[in-house]
Amino acid sequence: MNEIVITDTDFCRFRDYFYQKTGIFFENSKRYFVDKRLLQRIELTEHQSFRGYFTYLRFQASGEELQAVINALTVNETYFFREISQLESLVEEVLDDIVRHRPGELIRIWSMPCSSGEEPYSIVLFLLEHWPKLEQVDIEIIASDIDTGILQKAAQGIFSARSVKNLPNSSLNKYFSLRADGSYQLIDDIRQSVRFTQTNLNNRAEVQKLGAMDVIFCRNLLIYFDDISRRNAVESFYEQLNPGGVLFLGHSESMSRISSIFHVKRFRKSTGYYKPHKGKSDEKSNGR
C-alpha cells in the first residue's frame, strides 16, 4: 500500500467541512494533530487515498464516519472541581437568586461540553455538600457533548486517580467505590442524577430541543471556535437561558470580544454572564 499523503489543499477542504459541521476551526498549528487522526481513520476504513476517504465521509448516509471523526478530533481533558470558584458562586449566590425570583420551580443546569463527566458530576457533588436548600428544590442537570464515545464513558462514571485528585477523601469515600485497577466509580445514585445527551452546539435546532436553562457551564470550548462560531454559540446560550440565568465560561475566555448581548455579573468569587430580568440591568454589557 502506497503511503497516503494529506496535501495542503486536502487539509483545507477537510477543515472547512469540519467547521461547517461542528463550528470548530483548526488553525494551521493543529495540522499535525488533524493529519494524524485523519490518517488513522483512512486506514481503519481501508481507503487508498484522502480523496476517496473524503468522498466517503461526506456522502455516507448514516453519518457514522463523521461521528467517528468528531470523536477522534475533540479534546477531552478535565478533572473534578475544576475552577471551583464558579461552583462556589453557584451555591452561594446564583441558585439562591433564582429561587427568590421563581420559588417552587424546577431549576435546570446545563454542562456543555461535559466531556467524560467530571464537570456535571462535580456540580452534583458540590450541591450535595454545600447547598442546604437542595432537599427543598427540584434541580435537573443536563450534560451534553458532541462526542458520542465520551458520553458513553461519562455515563459509566469511572475515573482515574488523577481525575479525582481535587476531591476531599470524605467525598471519595462517600460517593465512589475503589476498583481493582485503582480507578474510582461513582455510586449509582450520582450517575443517575445527570442526563447525558449528544448535542452539536453548531446546530441551533438540537440546542433548542433541550429546553430553557437557568445556569449554563461552557468552559474551554469557545477557544476552539472562530469569531463567527463563538458569536453564534453565545447567542444560542442567551436564547436558552431563562431571564435571570447565568452563563459561566472558562477562566481564559472572555465575552468582551464575542458579543454584547450578556451583562457581566461579578460574584464574590467569580465572574459570570447574566441574562437580566425584563426591565432590569445589573451591570454594563460586554464586560470581561
Curated annotation (Swiss-Prot):
Catalytic activity from the UniProt record: L-glutamyl-[protein] + S-adenosyl-L-methionine = [protein]-L-glutamate 5-O-methyl ester + S-adenosyl-L-homocysteine
Pfam families referenced in this protein's UniProt entry, alphabetically: CheR, CheR_N
UniProt entry tagged with the keyword S-adenosyl-L-methionine: yes
Gene Ontology process terms (BP): methylation
Alphabetically ordered keywords of this record: Methyltransferase, S-adenosyl-L-methionine, Transferase
An example Gene Ontology molecular-function term: protein-glutamate O-methyltransferase activity
EC number(s) given by UniProt: 2.1.1.80
Ligand binding (S-adenosyl-L-methionine): N76, T78, R82, E119, D145, N200, L201, R219, N220
Keyword Metal-binding carried by entry: no
CheR-type methyltransferase domain residues: 1-280
Domain of life: Bacteria
Function of the molecule: Methylation of the membrane-bound methyl-accepting chemotaxis proteins (MCP) to form gamma-glutamyl methyl ester residues in MCP.
Protein name as it appears in the record: Chemotaxis protein methyltransferase 2
